[in-house]
Amino acid sequence: MLDPSIDSLMNKLDSKYTLVTVSARRAREMQIHQDQQIENTKSYKFVGKALEEIDAGLLTFEKEDQE
C-alpha cells in the first residue's frame, strides 16, 4: 500500500492533475535547492517526499483568477 494514500492526498488538493503538477514542481525544487520541509521521510525519492509534504499540509496550491 502506498503511503500517503491517494485518498488522503485528494482531500488536500482539488484534482489528480493538480496533485501531479504540484508534486512534480516541488520535487524539482528539492533536487535543485536540496531543501526539505520534513526531516524524516519514508520515501527516498523526491516525488515521494513532495507527496509527504502535501499530506502533512506543508505544501498547498492556490488557483489564480484568470480574466
From Swiss-Prot:
<protein>
    <recommendedName>
        <fullName>DNA-directed RNA polymerase subunit omega</fullName>
        <ecNumber>2.7.7.6</ecNumber>
    </recommendedName>
</protein>
<keyword id="KW-0548">Nucleotidyltransferase</keyword>
<comment type="subunit">
    <text>The RNAP catalytic core consists of 2 alpha, 1 beta, 1 beta' and 1 omega subunit. When a sigma factor is associated with the core the holoenzyme is formed, which can initiate transcription.</text>
</comment>
<comment type="similarity">
    <text>Belongs to the RNA polymerase subunit omega family.</text>
</comment>
<dbReference type="GO" id="GO:0003899">
    <property type="term" value="F:DNA-directed RNA polymerase activity"/>
</dbReference>
<keyword id="KW-0240">DNA-directed RNA polymerase</keyword>
<keyword id="KW-0804">Transcription</keyword>
<dbReference type="GO" id="GO:0000428">
    <property type="term" value="C:DNA-directed RNA polymerase complex"/>
</dbReference>
<dbReference type="InterPro" id="IPR006110">
    <property type="entry name" value="Pol_omega/Rpo6/RPB6"/>
</dbReference>
<dbReference type="GO" id="GO:0003677">
    <property type="term" value="F:DNA binding"/>
</dbReference>
<dbReference type="InterPro" id="IPR003716">
    <property type="entry name" value="DNA-dir_RNA_pol_omega"/>
</dbReference>
<comment type="function">
    <text>Promotes RNA polymerase assembly. Latches the N- and C-terminal regions of the beta' subunit thereby facilitating its interaction with the beta and alpha subunits.</text>
</comment>
<keyword id="KW-0808">Transferase</keyword>
<dbReference type="Pfam" id="PF01192">
    <property type="entry name" value="RNA_pol_Rpb6"/>
</dbReference>
<dbReference type="GO" id="GO:0006351">
    <property type="term" value="P:DNA-templated transcription"/>
</dbReference>
<dbReference type="InterPro" id="IPR036161">
    <property type="entry name" value="RPB6/omega-like_sf"/>
</dbReference>
